[in-house]
Amino acid sequence: MAASRTASTANTNNGASTAPLRISFAKIKEPLEVPNLLALQTESFDWLLGNDAWKARVEAALDSGQDVPTKSGLEEIFEEISPIEDFSGSMSLTFRDHRFEPPKNSIDECKDRDFTYAAPLFVTAEFTNNETGEIKSQTVFMGDFPLMTNKGTFVINGTERVVVSQLVRSPGVYFDSSIDKTSDKDIFSAKVIPSRGAWLEMEIDKRDMVGVRIDRKRKQSVTVLLKALGWTTEQILEEFGEYESMRATLEKDHTQGQDDALLDIYRKLRPGEPPTREAAQTLLENLYFNPKRYDLAKVGRYKVNKKLGGEAPLDAGILTVEDIISSIKYLVKLHAGETETVGDNGTSIVVETDDIDHFGNRRLRNVGELIQNQVRTGLARMERVVRERMTTQDVEAITPQTLINIRPVVASIKEFFGTSQLSQFMDQNNPLSGLTHKRRLSALGPGGLSRERAGFEVRDVHPSHYGRMCPIETPEGPNIGLIGSLASYGRVNAFGFVETPYRRVTDGVVTDEVDYLTADEEDRFVIAQANAPLGDDFRFEETRVLVRRRGGEVDYVPGDDVDYMDVSPRQMVSVATAMIPFLEHDDANRALMGANMMRQAVPLIKSEAPLVGTGMEYRCAVDAGDVLKSEKDGVVQEVSADYVTTANDDGTYTTYRLHKFSRSNQGTSVNQKVVVDEGARVIAGQVLADGPATENGEMALGKNLLVAFMPWEGHNYEDAIILSQRLVQDDVLSSIHIEEHEVDARDTKLGPEEITRDIPNVSEEVLADLDERGIIRIGAEVVAGDILVGKVTPKGETELTPEERLLRAIFGEKAREVRDTSLKVPHGEIGKVIGVRVFDREEGDELPPGVNQLVRVYVAQKRKITDGDKLAGRHGNKGVISKILPIEDMPFLEDGTPVDIILNPLGVPSRMNPGQVLEIHLGWLASRGWDVSGLADDWAQRLQAIEADQVAPGTNVATPVFDGAREDELAGLLQHTIPNRDGERMVLPTGKAPLFDGRSGEPFPEPISVGYMYILKLHHLVDDKLHARSTGPYSMITQQPLGGKAQFGGQRFGEMEVWALEAYGAAYALQELLTIKSDDVTGRVKVYEAIVKGENIPEPGIPESFKVLIKEMQSLCLNVEVLSSDGMSIEMRDTDEDVFRAAEELGIDLSRREPSSVEEV
């Protein structure tokens, strides 16, 4: 951030003066804005479609002399597949000029009605009959192509999804060395890895022989491959004669000439097949020299040229003989210990092994490329169909339409969005979690790593991550290090490598010119950090500057030797990490937890921006797309709860629709509130309405609460938290959660289901809140078990008595048996109905086959904060509420102000995150204001220089990461806070305050650290975890209760618990736990009967698991019998009739409910 702003200075974050006031402590002027945070997604998708936005970017890049691809993604694959020729080559089909029609439905309609937001794709297909020269051209529909919303998401079947970028090893040539276990010699190897096709691996073993592996098969001498490619022994000696290893390999190679070598290779690749020269030649051609089977891709060709000094054009996707020769030459030079060589293009090349975890060797597959690969697969499947149809159909009658079957293309796109590991259900907990999800980089997924095989090296932080991938934000657990987040300034270049910006330094003068460097370009330069002090002439003030060199080495060098300088101190961290104030004082492990927990914060009813921010809040909220922004300059004309209308300066009107209390993917409430007034002047990009967890266009994930660090009667032992009752009463930490309940009426074998108010055996009072259709009214308060939608399903036909048949003949179908299958509120849920949507096939709504009606009911609940909920700060300081104290019992300041929350001071030192303590001091300062305008101290002079010397009470402040408020500034400001009306300051200059015990009124013996901390309420709410069961579903085979809240399961009484009861001799308790409370089917029904009728509980029977054990032993051909005490064999037969008779009488449903998801099964 630039020099800090007061109300008059423009917001440096956005260029527009629309951001709310935030006084910044930043001392460093940044020459570059944070780029658009969603560009990673949107620009990649624009390239795939080749739309106008992409074309404009390409033109701008070409004008500035950059080398960028001028073909869009879809254009590339249609060109790649064209022409499709039949087997004889007499006819061909080509594709060109794809275009999109406008989408059929708007985004909101798609979400409402479970559609996919997609646009119809059309392609011009030309069929050419090469024998007659006849050309038939047609525009062919290629299916609906899912479109990206302007927020970087896709709407697939009504739900928002995100396609995560994948980090993969870049195609290219890699050299590696490992130590042989037996001889301690270095073994050098080379791998040529294509984008698709067979690998080519070479290695020099401990006997100094150069071997080659073709397509992962057995190893053979590299000279065999050279001979097969047409080289003679003389040529090989001439080229490689100076290297001992190649001479030795040639001597051991007994193949004579090209034919012999080809046959030798064929035998290794296809053992058991009769080798012929032609087959061998074709096989080798197909493996490496056929563009349909082998592709290095542009990026692979670029890496190969760069490594070996080649000159082949970037679109040469196949290997050349020169590439193979150069690779062998490089490998033998590496083995011979040479350090430099000259490439074919005359440049000098360093000979060294590669580090495969370096970001110069790992690239990103973005959304565009991932979808492109998927469409390529679909087109390849279609190509087979087209070929077959060409041969079977009559040539005269063929048109492009009759040849093309779009099913495989549509299916492969659907498959990708529906089932790929990289197409994920969007995390919509709050705007930050959505933004981070879109900027995520994953090394998992098809063609990537698997978390079981990934070692320590891949997961570790690498120096080349600097400014590209955040070293802090990554999940804890099995995915640590495999999933990362793009750094705040990073961008992806045309080859998929992540670039980061640096200021150019020429002759010791730091300029504002910015160059974007990839990781391998950066290795050549000496780079100073962003906080190196600069004089007024933009030269380095210190004689020696701290710099980074290759491989993360740190060094002090004179200013004239510096090539580049970081553009910003927050360049190396991701957006979420850049929102942690005083990050520089926190241990990385805790910062990691802090960044991850901010994504779990639940939007509260009333959002409040942090007193202590980092200046990233505004950009984060605006770029995440959950706030409503003005598209043009103008004046607000009309404002209501549901929409805003602006009269634009160009004479047009724009109406913006707001989201009111809609449900997010995670069940949190998405609600937008207007922040502008009628008649207000707005400029393009200004925030018109706040979304969830934003205030005035800034991220507002939590609340500023008054914190005291002190132990309190042991109630905050081990990170537990004590809260004030005020937070419950005033809904300070209350949030709204919305659940969606859905029921459909289908056609069954016995007739259609019916949604109705007429439900058998249900009293009128249960139906009180249902309307005449049988659907609950909006505004009804519901609790678990209440009927939301009445539905009846036909029962199986029974033999009718003549009387019943007569009745049915007279009164029609009405007498048919139906059972109640109504939608009821699930266990443990409670709330208010806020919305009902009905879809009916008869009214023209599209529904899945077999479904006649679909009803969705939305139930909202207000969750107040309660003990058991999880709270956290931004520094990884998390805890669970153990006690909520009355306001009068809370410790209070001298003026009577009670604190809101008490945290345990022991949670700070061992966790090494004192950033939270600095935060409470600065939070206190911001709430009270300060004035240091006349002081001559160093720290005061620094604040005067950035116009942060006079601050009114309650002003939000920013302390950017690595460039925030210093300790001496905080200490100084604590002495100069603005006093209250009585001229007193509640907090001493030490940052501590005398506190009084709310119960006795006595002061505590020592002053206590008090201040404002930003506290988040996390999504781990106790209401979602509490669970109880009496009877419920049982597992099919063992007949034991299921487990887990989702299955309405029971509490498992396991092996060790049984031992405990055995140890105490509690025989009867144990017997009933193992039988009638678990899997004694007959017994448990009889016990239920006995309880209902008030009789004594009967003797338990035989548990089902015992019967399963006997069956399993019988399946192993063991003859197992159960004998009674007098030696008689006992029949282990189920008396189902008894069970079902008793169950029927008691109205118990013994059938296990259908599982609602694959995981449950």
Curated annotation (Swiss-Prot):
Gene3D superfamilies: 2.40.50.100, 2.40.50.150, 3.90.1100.10, DNA-directed RNA polymerase, beta subunit, external 1 domain, DNA-directed RNA polymerase, subunit 2, domain 6, RNA polymerase alpha subunit dimerisation domain, RNA polymerase Rpb2, domain 2. It catalyses: RNA(n) + a ribonucleoside 5'-triphosphate = RNA(n+1) + diphosphate. The keyword Nucleotidyltransferase applies. GO terms for molecular function: DNA binding; DNA-directed RNA polymerase activity; ribonucleoside binding. Keywords: DNA-directed RNA polymerase, Nucleotidyltransferase, Transcription, Transferase. The gene is rpoB. CDD domains: RNA_pol_B_RPB2. GO terms for biological process: DNA-templated transcription. DNA-dependent RNA polymerase catalyzes the transcription of DNA into RNA using the four ribonucleoside triphosphates as substrates. This is DNA-directed RNA polymerase subunit beta. InterPro entries: DNA-dir_RNA_pol_bsu_ext_1_sf, DNA-dir_RNA_pol_bsu_external_1, DNA-dir_RNA_pol_su2, DNA-dir_RNAP_su2_dom, DNA-dir_RNAP_su2_hyb_sf, RNA_pol_bsu_bac, RNA_pol_bsu_CS, RNA_pol_bsu_protrusion. Its EC number is 2.7.7.6. The keyword Nuclease does not apply. Belongs to the RNA polymerase beta chain family. The RNAP catalytic core consists of 2 alpha, 1 beta, 1 beta' and 1 omega subunit. When a sigma factor is associated with the core the holoenzyme is formed, which can initiate transcription. GO terms for cellular component: DNA-directed RNA polymerase complex. It comes from the Bacteria. It comes from Streptomyces avermitilis (strain ATCC 31267 / DSM 46492 / JCM 5070 / NBRC 14893 / NCIMB 12804 / NRRL 8165 / MA-4680).
